[in-house]
Regions:
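Conserved beta/loop motifs at nucleotide-recognition and modification sites
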Residues: 1-354
Length: 354
């Protein structure tokens, strides 16, 4: 069975049609964890879980995993053997051959689940991972949980609010995404906090999560703070720009990470400006980068480029490159380099208005 959609796996679970091997991985770790736990619970059943639900990790021996796989279920139709974060790169060729043989010999009464709640891998570049996925597709199903689109994230947040007995208006959801980012684990945590506050204050029936609550209670992610910094730079807002840089250093963010995120914001603006000047909508810039589930970056860039020329954007990218080289090769303190960069970017934006 080839790579399947999450929805297809849910249908299999609902129908009780579980057998063979499943590999559950992907960028969206919240969904990897939730889907895998549901799969493991369904495959193991509720009978004698201490025998029929056996969990292993990357540190477990292949012999132990193999023995568990070969053992018959205890007073049940099937059992589940799960392995979390099995790192193919850390295994020898002999070990991997043993793994694939283990898959081949696994009895029909055992459901094997290899799931990746924390480990990321590149299945296209690494020959080991490429073979791992190919072998898995030949013997079972591979489910990759990708990043959600902004619309899907808004629906997720609305459902979580409803489960808790609250209402999340779309503007509040939009603001939450802008501030907390698009990682579902982080969003779920912030949503739980907002719902608890809304229920405690009892504003409305059911309680509504307002934009003011989001503004006051949700800490801004590094990416969001850098977006706001880019906005301030383009607007020529000296005080706000340096204030946001202070916030980033106060949060102990790595200077190279700050510069990287700021550079990404300027690249977004450059791409959007190029699309608009070519007579295309700003959304066309998405074809030049990975913007799936991150289209808000292009919307943010589109607002900024109204007041800045392509020439200034090119100059700004050159300044960012100089700062990057200075951070990596200069003896100057990182704060001094970034302070100087902010001044130069503000000056470039100001000259565009003269």
């Amino acid at each position: 069975m080839p790579t399947v959609e999450e929805s297809a796996l849910r249908k299999q679970m609902a129908a009780g049609e579980l057998s063979g091997l499943f590999v559950v991985a992907g960028e969206e770790k919240y969904m990897v964890g939730r889907l895998s736990k549901q799969l493991i619970k369904k495959a193991a059943g509720g009978t004698f879980p201490e025998f029929n639900n056996q969990a292993f990790t990357n540190e477990s021996s292949l012999e132990a995993i193999g023995d568990a796989s070969q053992a018959l279920p205890f007073f049940a139709e099937r059992k589940c053997v799960s392995v979390s974060d099995f790192d193919v790169e850390s295994k020898s060729a002999d070990e991997l051959n043993k793994l694939y043989e283990l898959w081949e010999l696994c009895p029909e009464t055992t459901v094997l689940v290899f799931w990746y709640p924390t480990l990321d891998f590149d299945g296209k570049r690494s020959s080991k991972w490429k073979k791992f996925l190919k072998q898995a597709e030949e013997r079972g199903a591979v489910v990759l949980c990708g990043r959600r689109s902004r619309t899907e994230l808004l629906r997720f947040l609305a459902r979580e609010a409803e489960k808790s007995g609250c209402v999340l208006p779309r503007p509040s959801g939009e603001r939450l995404l802008d501030y907390a980012g698009e990682d579902l684990t982080a969003l779920k945590s912030e949503m739980d906090k907002l719902c608890a506050y809304a229920l405690a204050t009892g504003q409305g029936q059911p309680p509504e999560i307002t934009r003011e609550m989001v503004e006051d209670m949700v800490p801004k992610s590094t990416e969001t703070t850098v977006f706001l910094l880019a906005n301030a730079l383009v607007a020529g807002d000296y005080e706000k720009a340096y204030g946001l840089l202070d916030v980033l250093f106060y949060q102990n963010e790595e200077p190279i990470a700050i510069l990287g995120a700021l550079g990404a914001s300027y690249v977004d603006m450059y791409r959007v400006r190029a699309a608009l000047e070519s007579g295309h909508p700003y959304q066309d810039a998405a074809q030049y980068g990975d913007y799936k589930g991150r289209d808000f970056r292009l919307r943010n860039a589109q607002k900024n480029v109204r007041s800045i020329s392509q020439g200034v954007l090119r100059q700004s990218l050159h300044l960012l490159l100089e700062a990057d080289l200075a951070l990596k090769g200069s003896r100057l303190e990182a704060r001094i380099i970034l302070d100087e960069l902010i001044a130069k970017l503000l000056l470039a934006a100001q000259e565009d208005r003269v």
